[in-house]
Amino acid sequence: TYIFWELVGVSSFLLIGFYYSKPSAVAASKKAFIVTRFADLGFLIGLLLLSYYAKGLDFAHINSQETIEQLNGIKVPFIGMSLLPLAAILIFMGAAGKSAMFPLHIWLPDAMEGPTPVSALIHAATMVVAGVYLVARLFPVFAVAKDAVAVVLTVGTFTALFAAIIAITQFDIKRVLAYSTLSQLGYMMLALGVASWEHPLGYTASMFHLTTHACFKALLFLGAGSVIHAVHTNDMREMGGLHSRLPITHITFLIACLAIAGVPPFAGFFSKDEILAAAYYSGHHLPFAVALLVAGLTAFYMFRLYFMTFWNEPKDLKKHEHAHESPFSMVFALVVLAIPSILAGFIPFGHYVYKGELEHHGINWLIASSSIFVGLCGICLAYLMYFRPNDLPSRFAYAFGFFYNIVYHKFYIDEIYLFITHNIIFKYISAPFNWFDRHCVDGFMDLTAQATLQAGRWLRSTVTGHLQTYFVWVIAGMILLCLIIWRLNEVIIWGLAIIGLSGILAAYIYQFVCALLKKTEPLKRIDRD
């Protein structure tokens, strides 16, 4: 799992940096790679802990009751919790990086630098949902590890609300969808956070929403790509009035917006309703309220995007006049994805999870009506503000000027990370380590090299080519060896010494005799210079 987990990260790095000639694309790919690698460090440590104490990494083995009880019984004294929640939190760290949970979300909006089909691939069905799927695969572990599931619930709830608020103020069509993805991933994590053995509906709801979200989010990204192909800009402030120019894109995009807004009978209604029901029935009333609020915000910012793009008045007449529907190869994919965006909610998803034991036999109309009501409120508010030209958006921005500016700049999270990196990590951590590396580590290595070089030069000076000198060195070596033998007094060393000395003496006697008989030339001084 870990190997292919890392290969997913490498693939996203290559896809995001597809336009390698663009500095922004290169920076975005490196940012995604570094952030996810940092998160994967926790994942790796968690895997090592499980491998050492559980004696295996097979999902069936780790999720078994015997293994869970064994890990839960091992205490970690310096942390104050058992090994099971510690390993689960570390694994969730990797999942949070891959699924862009706060505060490791900063790479995902910049991933928009890749081609739009790549964005659809990454944001809809592959990379970003891998973290959610990993937590779901380890549901038995998290269900027992209460500290870990509390972390999952807190992070998921905050991310869902945090990203939805930011999406309200963005004008780049792909960035709105990126923050929408963040919010929906938080929704899925929230569902897993409220799940337990007593109330397992959240587990099913999370996987159900993961499936439906893959359909309508891929449709949204490909629809955005069709719009960008027509008007050659990502800025929604330069769009408007495209419903007549892009009829197929318009209809399919509207279907996707209705699905993600949770309007019945589209797919998103059923999966969102399941998440709300899971939070409500499990007794997590604050996450339920936040999820309900996020449902309204989602409907608002998605129809804000829809009305600014396809209705209102054209902002750039030249671009509007030249806009045309995308070719068949592009709109065909939109039509295909529109079908599951409508019908995927009717799939009896419980049959694929626990053989029907998690099914419910009816709809809680209080929860369903609440979800529909907040969704319609969001749509109506977006209609009033963006369907026709008016000054409501500017008045809203002026009324909430300070807060609006903070939200528009994404709460300055990137700037905070940049400040921490440059002014704290580089200055107070990297600089001292750099000095230690250059002056201590490199200094020790340079000193060793110089000492070795000087020793070599000294030994080279002893090679004179005169047999008398060699004979003196042999005698000195014999005396030194005898002293060592005298101190150690070992039979084996005596034997080795006698054999070695005999060989040395035989060699020098042979060389001496050869020199006397002039059968060989005297040894010449070796000049290695």
Regions found by a protein language model. Give the residues of each.
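Hydrophobic H-region at the start of alpha-helical membrane spans
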Residues: F38-D40, T154, V335, A368-L376, ...
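Generic recognition of cysteine residues
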Residues: C215, C257, C377-C380, C440, ...
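Short phosphate-coordinating micro-motif centered on Lys-Gly-acidic
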Residues: E6
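Hydrophobic alpha-helical membrane-embedded segments
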Residues: K217-L219, G296-L305, V374-R395, L505-Q511
